[in-house]
Amino acid sequence: DGTPTDADVRHAIRAAHALGLSVMLKPHVDLWNDPNHWRGEIGPNFSNAQWNTWFAAYQRMITHYAALAAAEGVEQFAVGTELNTTVSHEANWRAVIAAVRAEFPGALTYAGDWTNAPDVPWWDALDLIGVDAYYPLAAAGNNTPTKAQLVAAWQPLLADLASLSAANGGQRILFTEVGYRSQNGAAQHPWDW
């Protein structure tokens, strides 16, 4: 599997802190044994028992990293990343978040996929709304949008984000990921790298 060792994670955190950077630890779950699917498609046909088993294992994993993050003085921690098919399991997530809070004293977020962040019903249990912001900003065929077109494309997205914040008591939004490659067409499908 591609999991770094705890020693490697600690080294990276310490190196970032030595440079004066703040650190968010944001563990990812990848499906190494299933290259045709991604983390947002975990368990689409799971039974309730299978979901409970999955969340028990997930909680063990994520609290391990929360404790590591706390020991290293990490400033922010993401309780999950783009686990789209799991977000409707509110009771399970609230239990995971409570277990993470018992280990980690800093700010907590969840890195919601841009298509799925509005569907998370438990933002109130976290300190920040996290969005992996790979929004398409150009129409199909527009490989080189102008600055004005990009600014215009952001306006409805900013309004949607403001609504998401307002619906959650004015909670702040953090872009937990954002990126556009330096190539023609990147603004159409920025997640496709």
Predicted regions and their residues:
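Aromatic-lined carbohydrate-recognition surfaces of secreted/lumenal glycan-active proteins
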Residues: 22-29, 75-88, 96-118, 170-178
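Well-ordered, non-membrane alpha-helical segments in soluble/globular domains
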Residues: 3-9, 59-62, 93-95, 148-160
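Short, electropositive alpha-helical surface patch
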Residues: 35-54, 91-99, 184-193
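Glycoside hydrolase catalytic-domain groove-lining segments
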Residues: 11, 26, 107-109, 116-192
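Surface-exposed amphipathic alpha-helices with a cationic face
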Residues: 10-22, 70, 93-105, 161-168
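Substrate-binding cleft and catalytic face of glycoside hydrolase catalytic domains
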Residues: 1-86
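Short, isolated positions within intrinsically disordered regulatory regions of eukaryotic proteins
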Residues: 42, 55-58, 97, 126-127, ...
